[in-house]
Amino acid sequence: MNPKKSIQLWELQSLLKGATYKKLIEKKTYEAGKERADNYDFLFMSFISFIVSCRLFILVFTFIFKGFPSAIQVIAMIDAVVNALLILIVLAMLFIGSRKLTVEIRRGEVEDFQENLKAREDTFNSSPYQRY
């Protein structure tokens, strides 16, 4: 078997039965969700830094050109553009967060998971502290 090749859902269901199937799916879903959450933190921090830098630029620009009436119009226009960009970024972040989570399981992972579960069960069954 090729461990690099993805496995189809019906093959996975035929290889693993009942609780074992559910455990593997839960494990892989958790890993995929954790990976997405790590990327989401970076996007969130980039978003916050963009907001702060744009607002500071507008504040400095306001103090420098306070006496010129045309400068107020420029500041208002810059503020409107920044607000539009922020709305687009928020929509992009919501889209990224709402995408369907893709879980990919490889053949080698299924075999390793079965072996690990079997080893754990054997260890538990041979334990002197086993409950009756």
Curated annotation (Swiss-Prot):
Membrane topology, record value: Multi-pass membrane protein
This protein's record includes keyword Metal-binding: no
Subcellular location: Cytoplasm; Membrane
TM region positions: 44-64, 75-95
Keywords: Cytoplasm, Membrane, Transmembrane, Transmembrane helix
A GO-annotated cellular component: cytoplasm
Keyword Ribonucleoprotein: no
Name listed for the protein in its UniProt record: Putative uncharacterized membrane protein C622.03c
Organism of derivation: Schizosaccharomyces pombe (strain 972 / ATCC 24843) (Fission yeast)
